[in-house]
C-alpha cells in the first residue's frame, strides 16, 4: 500500500512546533509493510491542502493527515477531505454527546466547538480519550484518508489503541525493526566482530549505526504476520548477543543507566559517585531510573580541590604532586569512597571540560575494593564532553561488575 503523510499546521512551517508525528507514523507504516512515498508539511491554507490531498489520492492508496481538527476557522482538514472525495459532513452523535459532557452542557462552549463533532458521511470515527478532537478513516473507490489529531500526546494513543488494528486488515506483509544497544566498543571494533553476520543476513537484515554516543544494531524482519517477524528478530538478536557478549547493554530505547540499575538490582549492590567534571550528571542519570534509591547510597559533587580534600579525604599532596586531573586523583577518590562510606561500587570523575586540555578526563571505577582507572580524550563542547564521560563511566562500571561477577561464579 502506498502512503502519503501530510502534517497540517502553519506553526510547523514557521518552526514553532517540530513535526515528530510524521517520523512516528513512517515507522508504524513500515511495520505494517506499507510504503511511505511522500511526507509533506502544509500550512492552514485550504487551497494548498486541497491540492496536496487531491494529488496524493491520485498517486497513493492511503493519505494520513495530522492536525487541523480543532474548532476554529483555520482547522480545515476534514472539510478538505470531504470536498476532495465529494462527501457531506454529518454530525456524529457519539462525539456530540462527549462534547456536551466535556463542556458540562454549556451551550455557548458546545456551539463554539461543534465543528469537532462533524465528520464525513460513512466515516469510521475513533474517539480521542486524551482530547476533544476525535478522528476518522474514510474510504472512497479504494482510496482511504485517515485524519489524526496534531498533538503527539493525543495522536499516538489513538493510533496505537484504535487505528492500528483497523489498518492491519489491509496489510499483506509486516515489517518490524528492533535494536540492540552496544557500549564501549568503537564503530570499527563492533563492525569487525559482527561483519560476517551483517553480510550474511538478508531477512532479517542487520544494519549498524550511531545515535547519541550509542552503537546500535538495527534488526529488521519482513514476514506475513507480526509474531513471525518478532520470532525471526529474536533469533537474530541472540546470534548477535552471543558474538558481542557483555557489550550489549540493552534493546530499543533502554538507556545505559537503566541497564546499570538492572545489574545493581540483580546482584544487590550499592553504589556511590564522586564527581568533579561531570558535576552530578552521573547521579542525575541514575536518579532518572525508578527504584534506584535502593542502591544509590550517596553522591558527592567535589568540583573544587577543597571539596575533594574536605568531603572525600583525597590527600592534598596527591593533588599537588600529580595534578587534580590525573589517574592518581581518580584512583584515590574511589579508594576514599570505599574507606569512608562502605559501598559495593563507586565511580569518580576528574577532567577538563574546556580550555587548552579540554576533553582530557580520568574516570575511577570500583567494585568491592577492586579499583581501576580509565583515561579518556574526548572532543566537543563542554556539556557534550560531560555527557559522554557520564555514559562511558556507567558503561565501564556495568562491564566491570559483570566481569567480576562472572569470575566469582566459577
Swiss-Prot record:
<comment type="similarity">
    <text>Belongs to the CinA family.</text>
</comment>
<dbReference type="InterPro" id="IPR041424">
    <property type="entry name" value="CinA_KH"/>
</dbReference>
<dbReference type="InterPro" id="IPR050101">
    <property type="entry name" value="CinA"/>
</dbReference>
<protein>
    <recommendedName>
        <fullName>Putative competence-damage inducible protein</fullName>
    </recommendedName>
</protein>
<dbReference type="InterPro" id="IPR008135">
    <property type="entry name" value="Competence-induced_CinA"/>
</dbReference>
<dbReference type="InterPro" id="IPR008136">
    <property type="entry name" value="CinA_C"/>
</dbReference>
<dbReference type="Pfam" id="PF00994">
    <property type="entry name" value="MoCF_biosynth"/>
</dbReference>
<dbReference type="Pfam" id="PF18146">
    <property type="entry name" value="CinA_KH"/>
</dbReference>
<dbReference type="InterPro" id="IPR036653">
    <property type="entry name" value="CinA-like_C"/>
</dbReference>
<dbReference type="InterPro" id="IPR001453">
    <property type="entry name" value="MoaB/Mog_dom"/>
</dbReference>
<dbReference type="Pfam" id="PF02464">
    <property type="entry name" value="CinA"/>
</dbReference>
<dbReference type="InterPro" id="IPR036425">
    <property type="entry name" value="MoaB/Mog-like_dom_sf"/>
</dbReference>
Amino acid at each position: 500500500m502506498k502512503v502519503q503523510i501530510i502534517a497540517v499546521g502553519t506553526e510547523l512551517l514557521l518552526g514553532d512546533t517540530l513535526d515528530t508525528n510524521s517520523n512516528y507514523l513512517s515507522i508504524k507504516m513500515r511495520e505494517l509493510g506499507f510504503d511511505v512515498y511522500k511526507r509533506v508539511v502544509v500550512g492552514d491554507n485550504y487551497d494548498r491542502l486541497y491540492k496536496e490531498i487531491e494529488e496524493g489520492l491520485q498517486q497513493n492508496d492511503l493519505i494520513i493527515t495530522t492536525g487541523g481538527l480543532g474548532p476554529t476557522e483555520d482547522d480545515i482538514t476534514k472539510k478538505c477531505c470531504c470536498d476532495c472525495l465529494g462527501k457531506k459532513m454529518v454530525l456524529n452523535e457519539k462525539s456530540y454527546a462527549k462534547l456536551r459532557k466535556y463542556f458540562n452542557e454549556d451551550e455557548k462552549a458546545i456551539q463554539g466547538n461543534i465543528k469537532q463533532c462533524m465528520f464525513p458521511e460513512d466515516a469510521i470515527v475513533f474517539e480521542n480519550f486524551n482530547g476533544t478532537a476525535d478522528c476518522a478513516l474514510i474510504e472512497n473507490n479504494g482510496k482511504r484518508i485517515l485524519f489524526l489529531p496534531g498533538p503527539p500526546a493525543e495522536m499516538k494513543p489513538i493510533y496505537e489503541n484504535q487505528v492500528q488494528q483497523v489498518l492491519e486488515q489491509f496489510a499483506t506483509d509486516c515489517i518490524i525493526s528492533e535494536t540492540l544497544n552496544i557500549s564501549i566498543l568503537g564503530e570499527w571494533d563492533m563492525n569487525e566482530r559482527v561483519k560476517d553476520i551483517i553480510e550474511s543476513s538478508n531477512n532479517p537484515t542487520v544494519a549498524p549505526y550511531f545515535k547519541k554516543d550509542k552503537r546500535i544494531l538495527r534488526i529488521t524482519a519482513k514476514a506475513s504476520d507480526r509474531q513471525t517477524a518478532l520470532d525471526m528478530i529474536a533469533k537474530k538478536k541472540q546470534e548477535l548477543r552471543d558474538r558481542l557478549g557483555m557489550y550489549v547493554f540493552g534493546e530499543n530505547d533502554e538507556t545505559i543507566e537503566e541497564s546499570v540499575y538492572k545489574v545493581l538490582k540483580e546482584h544487590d549492590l550499592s553504589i556511590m559517585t564522586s564527581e568533579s567534571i561531570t558535576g552530578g550528571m552521573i547521579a542525575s542519570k541514575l536518579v532518572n531510573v525508578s527504584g534506584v534509591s535502593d542502591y544509590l547510597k550517596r553522591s558527592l559533587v567535589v568540583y573544587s580541590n577543597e571539596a575533594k580534600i574536605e568531603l572525600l579525604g583525597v590527600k592534598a599532596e596527591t593533588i599537588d604532586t600529580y595534578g587534580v586531573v590525573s589517574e592518581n586523583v581518580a584512583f584515590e577518590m574511589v579508594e576514599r569512597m570505599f574507606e569512608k562510606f562502605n559501598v559495593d561500587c563507586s565511580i569518580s570523575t576528574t577532567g577538563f571540560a574546556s580550555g587548552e586540555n579540554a576533553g582530557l578526563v580520568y574516570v575511577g571505577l570500583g567494585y568491592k575494593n577492586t579499583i581501576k582507572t580509565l583515561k579518556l580524550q574526548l572532543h566537543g563542547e563542554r556539556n557534550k564532553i560531560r555527557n559522554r564521560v557520564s555514559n562511558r563511566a556507567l558503561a565501564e562500571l556495568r562491564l566491570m561488575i559483570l566481569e567480576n561477577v562472572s569470575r566469582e561464579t566459577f
